[in-house]
Amino acid sequence: MSLLAEDTAAADLGLRWKPGFRALGPAFLTELRPTPLPDPPYWVGHSEAAARLLGLPADWRQSEGTLAALTGNLPVAGTLPFATVYSGHQFGVWAGQLGDGRAIMLGETEGGLEVQLKGAGRTPYSRGADGRAVLRSSIREFLCSEAMHGLGIPTTRALCVTGSDARVYREMPETAAVVTRVAPSFIRFGHFEHFSASQRDAELRALADYVIDRYYPDCRSTSRFNGNAYAAFLEAVSERTAALLAQWQAVGFCHGVMNTDNMSILGLTIDYGPFQFLDGFDPRHICNHSDTSGRYAFNQQPNVAYWNLFCLAQALLPLIGDQEIAVAALESYKTVFPREFESRMRAKLGLAEPAEGDRALIEGVLKLMAAEKVDYTIFWRRLSQHMAGGNAEPVRDLFLDRAGFDAWLLSFSERHAQLPRAQAADLMLRSNPKYVLRNHLGQQAIEAASQKDFSAVATLLALLETPFEEHPGADAYAGFPPDWASTIEISCSS
């Protein structure tokens, strides 16, 4: 029986749909419908920017049918929902079959965007779990998805969060919520690992061909690797991943759970769980309370990404056909990451063009910051404001080692001596955000939302969508975290 939502009870979102990933067939997915929540849903937060990206009509939230549909309580006209199967390595250990345990794909729009409901109920891949998401984790994912987009970092998007008074149980009873996620593709490294590990080469090839033809068509005409399109594909994914990690490290973003099933094949930030933007700069910071070994510590992220790419290379080996070629396809990561990272850090310093000594300038200030765990975001913003004509004292006040910082600041000033200061200041203010989604800000929004006050979610979203702007009157959102912020524990259930 077809699950295609043609019945009169279906909600029409005003979107046209096409087969997309579903055309790969039943080996890759299971058709199913979301499980309705027992309590009436309500809007928690929404992104008009994501709505415009999808091409939704201006009044898209006015229909009760839309609210019900984006909570999983009503079918969406023209869709055939499904969940996908994948496998992966979790904390460095092969975990076997995983899959979309609480995410159900509505489908792909004619504009080429997949729409997914996260928290919409059990799937065949839920592994005994309830398939639900809780309000706190849903708000965090919604806000961070849009915050990363505001920062210019590749990411899945979030259209909205809907809530319900239905109870779900984690460490404590909580209320259920659903995030509507949007991306060109939600395909992960783990999708390839699944078919490779089970030696299903035909399905592995079909998946790789689908991804190459849809998202990496230039790999078909490459002269690299003797025209091996699969090796060229691996190299392209490596380069996108390297560029993504450079942006994470430059902005101070700690993902927290970089398992291979949480790695996007398109180089997007995906699966916002126990993430954190650094407060004090600690290269060894571990944001995930569940990560007792520190595998996913902030300074380990670039190495972990390369390890994950090596797992992808192993998965693609039946298609690439030569281990040496597969290893060679990974080499670009080692050049792209440092190049992109230094480029991002130079921009934070207001340096549009590279020069000898820039690396020492970057490493020098990071060392000073790490020694005293100086607030990462505030330091860079204050340095930008100093370059824009402000006093140096607000920057100096961040350091106890004034002599050490003054020596660095002198080197910084000498580097800029022959450069246009206004242009440098403009570059810095465009590269160093004033607002990031700090844990305590998210927590305050979550606590308010749990009392049905969603204004804090909307206020935060407005700031995070344009984080480089000053936003007069919002300085409280750009200040130092309160002492209690250090007691917030986030884990894989977050």
UniProtKB/Swiss-Prot annotation:
The active site is at 261 (proton acceptor). ATP binds at residues 99, 101-102, 118, 130-131, 181, 188, 271. Mg(2+) binds at residues 262, 271. NCBIfam families: PRK00029.1. Belongs to the SELO family. Nucleotidyltransferase involved in the post-translational modification of proteins. It can catalyze the addition of adenosine monophosphate (AMP) or uridine monophosphate (UMP) to a protein, resulting in modifications known as AMPylation and UMPylation. This is Protein nucleotidyltransferase YdiU. It comes from Variovorax paradoxus (strain S110). The gene is ydiU.
